[in-house]
Amino acid sequence: MGYREDVKRMKALTDENRLAILLALQHGEKCGCELLEELNITQPTLSHHMRILADSGLVAYYKEGKWMHYSISAKDVQEFRDMVGSYARCDCETDSSVICRCENES
């Protein structure tokens, strides 16, 4: 995955509504109707934010009848965590040819 995909995922988390949606989904799948009521937002607002979360890969969805059902994409969230962690590590942790002084800094 490249920088553009990393940025896309990070940007998906820079909105209060999207963070609230992820928190609402952390205990399992929810119907769009449940999210509308729980978060007190409109249908167009939910659709907008879900599209961004789904495009970033953080949320999965499927349609049942007239309602969309949403859940956190565990695999993609783990990839996101790994990606964030990779930016926090020094190259010397994974590449023995890199010489640095990070071990002395903490």
Language-model segments: which ranges?
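Residues in the helix-turn-helix
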Residues: 45
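Alpha-helical residues within the helix-turn-helix
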Residues: 37, 48, 54-55
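Amphipathic alpha-helical dimerization/coiled-coil segments
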Residues: 2-5, 74-106
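Histidine-centered divalent metal-coordination motifs
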Residues: 18, 48-49
